[in-house]
UniProtKB/Swiss-Prot annotation:
Chain's gene name: rsmA
UniProt-listed InterPro entries: KsgA/Erm, rRNA_Ade_diMease-like_C, rRNA_Ade_Mease_Trfase_CS, rRNA_Ade_methylase_Trfase_N, rRNA_adenine_dimethylase, SAM-dependent_MTases_sf
This enzyme's EC code(s): 2.1.1.182
One of the record's GO cellular component terms: cytosol
Similarity section: Belongs to the class I-like SAM-binding methyltransferase superfamily. rRNA adenine N(6)-methyltransferase family. RsmA subfamily.
Gene3D superfamilies the record matches: Ribosomal RNA adenine dimethylase-like, domain 2, Vaccinia Virus protein VP39
UniProt-recorded name of the protein: Ribosomal RNA small subunit methyltransferase A
Length: 271
């Protein structure tokens, strides 16, 4: 196939600011990203927002079976050409990733999620993938591109300025790491900020915890992060009393409460 940059030029395609698009053309960089999940030969990979298909090409070169969801109709002809070049490996679905059921699309098989997430929906998709009631999930790993600031919030330790709701939701039942930083100059057009690849793999879930309760607790707690817990959590019935019973001082602020403490509080409220 011709180089991706040439294919994009021939089709007269440009990145859409409205869709949060920034294209990657560096094949070596894309191959490095596709290698982060490990051996994908024969594996199923779900990709969000492939755009013109740069990362898709790299994933297909690993031997993976890729299911790609793209809402930008301008990109569909390029992806159709890619499907012809890799027969039987690529399925393209024209839809909004927020509207699809990944487990249903993958036929119940385990899968990896690899995506250069559009900046405008990345966090919403990420938290959705972290909140299924059943655990471990069907996904085996998440390899996701975020703005560096968001990536740092996902892996942040307790007590740091970056630590917040994203860190708790990511770390309470998954292992999270920054696998790679990507300079803004690697993109076309260059975004205003640096990016990073975050990789997550499922860990054992602490027993007796309802993810919906944990989600609500952290939403309240970190929604007013400068307030003491006795103020930020007072809208949740029994939360302050449960915190005191667990030895969590209600005069503390949310950013000082560890992942394990948030989990213990969610468990107590779920009884």
């Amino acid at each position: 196939m011709p180089p991706l940059r040439e294919t994009v030029r021939v089709h007269g395609l440009s990145a859409s600011k409205a869709l949060g698009q920034n294209f990657l053309f560096d094949e070596q960089l894309l191959d490095r990203i596709a290698a982060i999940p490990g051996d994908l030969d024969g594996a199923t990979v779900f990709e969000v927002g492939p755009g013109p298909g740069g990362l898709t090409r790299a994933l297909l070169r690993t031997g993976a079976r890729v299911i790609a969801v793209e809402r930008d109709e301008r990109c569909l002809p390029l992806l159709a050409d890619l499907a012809e070049a890799f027969p039987g490996q690529l399925t393209v679905i024209a839809d909004d990733a927020m509207a699809v059921d990944v487990d249903a699309l993958t036929g119940g098989d385990p899968y990896h999620i690899v995506a250069n997430l559009p900046y405008n929906v990345g966090t919403a998709l990420f938290t959705r993938w972290l909140e299924p009631a059943a655990w471990p999930p069907r996904w085996l790993s998440l390899t996701l591109m975020f703005q560096l600031e968001v990536a740092e919030r996902i892996v942040a330790p307790v007590g740091t300025s970056a630590y917040g709701r994203l860190a708790v939701l990511a770390q309470w039942r998954a292992r999270a790491r920054i696998a790679m930083k990507v300079h803004r100059s690697a993109f076309t057009p260059p975004p205003k900020v640096m990016s990073a690849i975050v990789q997550l793999t499922p860990a054992d879930q602490p027993p007796g915890v309802d993810p919906r309760i944990l989600s609500r607790l952290t939403e309240k707690g970190f929604g007013q992060r400068r307030k003491m817990l006795r103020q930020s959590l007072k809208g949740i019935d029994g939360a302050v009393a449960a915190a005191e019973a667990l030895g969590i001082d209600p005069t503390r602020r949310a950013e000082t409460v560890s992942v394990a403490e948030w989990v213990a509080l969610a468990r107590a409220l779920g009884r």
